């Protein structure tokens, strides 16, 4: 009976589906099952200034596609990022508040997913390529260090002192997808399209300029990349504020510091102005008040969408080439409304001054730097303590393919290793090399 039921279901499916070369019919509706046809179909539904598909030669290595590949190129990039080890490790990397201190603190992974959701929503509203925006968003923080920005600043300082370049997480993210990750025996990296790689690099400024092929000095050439760059800032500021409120850290800090309390009150006033909440004034100290963050995010997302439409109309943007020409002049088209931008900048300045200066965060940052410093100095003084695969890289840093643009490559191997650690692994590795009583 089970076999008969299976056969019946298969016959029903065959009646619904009709395969014909590059097309499949589902109840009479024809859909492409060929990558080229799928990407060509985007031209009918996306705006003329969107990135329809990658340019020729966008991947460094030629990809071998199945004849009936049913994903577009940017969807493939998205999937490669999701299945990478670096992406999985984001789950155990601190955003601002160390995640093992509370079950609901955001991590690099949750932040990344939130940025991807914002980016897809705005891209859909503007008829941009959602797949490209999502791929950029999912890859934008792959190069982040454990324990948040404190370790990034430490590694940057070490390289700068040694005159060996700089360390910025956006550049490291490109380095992860270009060299550190591996999906083929024939080459290093994930072999992503240049459109995705450029967006990852430019979600923050490329201050070192080591990826010259991606035009580091200009804003992102795609509107999809510009969307990710802006919503990344919106996401982390709003959600870091929310985590601070829900944890009770902000309320406790207000009770101890008058200046801090004044700054938080100013943030509250600005948010009330942004939300135009004349009838009901919200505060930012109690858990019950955190739901206003959703309203704030909605307000900012709508501001971005509406102002970006106005920018596109005002600048008479009709093609992707128009977007690129403005980018070459240093101008972006994805922006907040001017009055909202001014208020948001003030909120950002106050959050950096007050929330990120909370004693608990500063204590966690100090401990993180101590761990990173001990690891760095230990590996510099005795590279043989590196794991075998990292030691192999250390001994073969004359490979120009992997270290192009970097000076004194051995130090960069150590930076790569530390930057790739999760919070948990960094603590375990620190214990392994610093505690004489631990078993090896």
Predicted regions and their residues:
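Short alpha-helix carrying the canonical HExxH Zn2+-binding catalytic motif
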Residues: 134-139, 230-231
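Histidine-centered, transition-metal-coordinating active-site segments
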Residues: 6, 10-112, 116-122, 130, ...
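Ser/Thr-rich, low-complexity intrinsically disordered segments
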Residues: 1-5
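A generic membrane alpha-helix/interface feature
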Residues: 145, 158-159, 250, 440
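A glycine- and small-aliphatic-rich helix-loop capping segment at beta-alpha/alpha-beta transitions
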Residues: 148-161
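Short active-site segment of divalent metal-dependent hydrolases/proteases
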Residues: 139, 143-144, 235
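Short strand->helix junction
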Residues: 105, 144-145
